[in-house]
């Protein structure tokens, strides 16, 4: 089955990482994997554009079925391989509701993170304002405090209850990215505990960004968030 | 079942409308519905904040289960009431893949729409730039042309294939919002045909924004997009 699958991905990208974690969790490791370089602009190559007119990674294919949106690929894989590997959507209605709620709140977290980390990359120099940088950091901090509360209530190991789920698949890569960019452990103890606990999970370890392994030192952009 | 459900919503809001369409499609019309006013700031009321710390609409509850993210509520309702009303996730793997892909691409469409329509509301006056307004409009136009192509390929009635699905639930309210804000029919014939066809669907008619019925005249903000 996995031999029919092709994933084009970039190292460190949270959306790519989500798909890779699900492929690990569902025992679909035999997929065709191709690491591309954002720095070299390979996400705009003809190979990517033919699968993904947006020129983005991940670009994912199962046979002739194209699923480039990371949430779409994750939902599809869980649905098609429900009884293979680990179950990623809980049956219990209360746990399932919490899982969907946190999974989609994860998009807001990702957005507020991107507003800070990609600011200089996304906003042309003539349109940049210190006031916007400050506000984006405050918004990210407010968002992160909400997740601190959520994790306190679930007592820490998983983001939506008692078991690893698509909510963790969606949220963990962003959390790791935040720490990679200098989030301070002292200010976010629950997120730190969550990060430290999940980074040892086999599916996550196996898909850890190779560029992070090569140069373990991250950046300090978020040290004052 | 639906009597255990409460939806706090605002008229015209695409995320609120998504949940209302699913409730109609799944024959759950007996839910407790409370229309709140964004203009009066009722989305920041104590009632909303107690269900939704983000102070946003929709705020949705099924018993004690809270699902405020519209995509989360839609996924949950389809999962819990699979065999009730209309099936909103196709079984066929190819159709399902397309459905998830379009559903999540819908978030990008919503984002690019928001970047244009909410610009003055979101960006403080001292940080506004004509160049950003122009770029946002161009990005929205590029995005809409992609959807024109998608609709051409599916031959128009539904956004992800042969039947109405969660992809339409996710995308249609945004399309209606675009036309409400002045998108021109001449430039987007496929989106226009899609809009005209789906606006007659019973679930959509029954949940049409009451403020739009009261004052049918929209705005012309998008006339040059």
UniProtKB/Swiss-Prot annotation, chains A, B:
Keywords recorded for this protein, A-Z: Cytoplasm, Transferase
Ranges where the GST N-terminal domain occurs: 3-85
GO cellular component entries: mitochondrion
Principal EC category: transferase
Enzyme Commission (EC) number: 2.5.1.18
Subunit record text: Homodimer.
Protein name according to UniProt: Glutathione S-transferase A
Organism per entry: Pleuronectes platessa (European plaice)
């Amino acid at each position: 089955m996995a031999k029919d699958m092709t994933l084009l991905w970039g190292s460190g990208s949270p959306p790519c990482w989500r798909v890779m974690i699900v492929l690990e969790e569902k025992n679909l490791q035999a997929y065709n994997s191709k690491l591309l370089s954002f720095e070299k602009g390979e996400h705009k190559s003809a190979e990517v554009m033919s699968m993904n007119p947006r020129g983005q990674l991940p670009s994912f294919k199962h046979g002739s079925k194209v699923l480039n949106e990371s949430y779409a690929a994750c939902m599809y894989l869980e649905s098609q391989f429900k009884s293979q590997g680990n179950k990623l959507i809980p049956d219990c209605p209360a746990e399932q509701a919490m899982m969907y709620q946190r999974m989609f709140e994860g998009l807001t977290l990702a957005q507020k993170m991107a507003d800070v980390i990609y600011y200089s990359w996304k906003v042309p120099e003539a349109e940049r304002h210190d006031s916007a940088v400050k506000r984006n950091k405050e918004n990210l901090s407010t968002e992160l405090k909400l997740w601190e509360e959520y994790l306190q209530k679930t007592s820490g190991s998983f983001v939506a209850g008692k078991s690893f789920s698509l909510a963790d698949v969606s949220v963990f890569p962003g959390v790791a990215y935040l720490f990679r960019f200098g989030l301070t452990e002292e200010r976010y103890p629950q997120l730190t505990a969550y990060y430290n606990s999940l980074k040892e999970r086999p599916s996550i370890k196996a898909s850890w960004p190779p560029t992070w392994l090569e140069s373990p030192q991250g950046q300090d952009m978020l040290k004052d968030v």
